[in-house]
Curated annotation (Swiss-Prot):
This is Probable quorum-quenching lactonase YtnP. GO terms for molecular function: hydrolase activity; metal ion binding. Its EC number is 3.1.1.-. Zn(2+) 2 binds at residues 115-116, 212, 257. Its cofactor is Zn(2+). It comes from Bacillus subtilis (strain 168). Binds 2 Zn(2+) ions per subunit. Pfam families: Lactamase_B (PF00753). It comes from the Bacteria. Probable hydrolase that is able to inhibit the signaling pathway required for the streptomycin production and development of aerial mycelium in S.griseus. Thus, serves as a defensive strategy against competing bacteria. The putative target for YtnP may be a gamma-butyrolactone termed A factor, which is the quorum-sensing signaling molecule that positively regulates streptomycin production and development of aerial hyphae in S.griseus. InterPro entries: MBL_superfamily_lactonases (IPR051013), Metallo-B-lactamas (IPR001279), RibonucZ/Hydroxyglut_hydro (IPR036866). Disulfide bonds: none annotated. Belongs to the metallo-beta-lactamase superfamily. The gene is ytnP.
């Protein structure tokens, strides 16, 4: 597992499974001859997208960003459609760190689409139960409302199987939430109406998790937004805002979906200054 430090904050990437989504959907109106130069694509026009939760450890707290694809939650048809070739191994990942799911204090849900929220619940016999029974689950109030009352478009990604069993653990926020000193969530909208980003700051160092406003390093251009985005004209200025914040702080960007990089810093000209590459198994 890859790990890095932001000041006294430790970040570790867990194994949350993998999807292979349509490249055209992931890059929206950007022509394939452009995006395919920046991110690998297979013969089915799919790109590899990890669904790997990021464990944040600070002040004795164990915090996870998003929950992975889950295990035993998807039908064969769903696995085919979403290119799922491996389900979540979050429990073994935690065990390798001397932790269990019961040790997780907080889950910071940037949004509640299935590829981020399936790992919140699991089947115990015929019944769905919480995977992280002791955790507070934070998400924006808008996202929580969207999850429980999806519209004709969003019902394909907001599933009751992912929220009903954990409803009692959820706490919402409006604009900004401080999880603990130096770790904050900020409602952005864009990808979904309730989408949020997460910032880690400690000892003069900063990491920015743009979540699905910038799911991979290839989405750095503010105009390269997803066809999946419900509000692309919100995504663009929010990307600009948080990229400017990151540039001012010389921040790292950390990724949940990227198959190549766990984290990186960019130079002003767009070249990569430093990186933590994903160790491919």
């Amino acid at each position: 597992m890859e790990t890095m430090k932001i000041g006294n904050i430790t970040l570790t990437w867990l194994d949350g499974g993998v999807t292979h989504m349509d490249g055209g959907a992931m890059f929206g109106v950007v022509p394939k001859p452009l995006w395919s130069k920046k991110y690998p694509v297979n013969e089915k026009n799919q790109i590899e997208l990890r669904t790997d939760p990021i464990l944040i450890q600070k002040d004795g707290l164990n915090i996870i960003i998003d929950a992975g694809i889950g295990y035993g939650k998807l039908t064969d048809k769903q696995k085919r459609n979403y290119g799922v070739t491996q389900e979540s191994n979050v429990k073994p990942s935690l065990a390798a760190l001397g932790l269990t799911v019961a040790d997780i204090d907080v889950i910071a849900m940037t949004h509640l689409h299935f590829d981020h929220a399936c790992g919140l619940t699991e089947y115990e016999g015929e019944r769905l139960v919480s995977v992280f029974p002791n955790a507070v689950i934070y998400t924006s109030a808008v996202e929580w409302d969207e999850m429980r009352h999806p519209n004709i478009r969003s019902k394909n990604t907001y599933w009751k199987e992912n929220w009903e069993a954990v409803a009692g653990q959820v706490k919402t926020f409006e604009d900004t939430l401080t999880i603990t000193e130096g770790i904050t969530m900020h409602h952005t909208g864009g990808h979904s109406d309730g989408h949020s980003v997460l910032i880690c700051e400690d000892a003069g160092e900063t990491a920015v998790h743009m979540a699905d406003l910038m799911p991979t390093h290839a989405h750095r251009n503010p105009l390269w937004v997803l066809a999946y985005d419900d509000y692309p004209m919100t995504s663009i200025p929010q990307k600009q805002k948080w990229q400017a914040f990151a540039a001012e702080k010389d921040a790292w960007f950390i990724f949940y979906h990227d198959a190549e990089y766990r984290a990186l810093q960019w130079e002003e000209d767009g070249s990569i200054k430093k990186s933590v590459k994903r160790m491919k198994r």
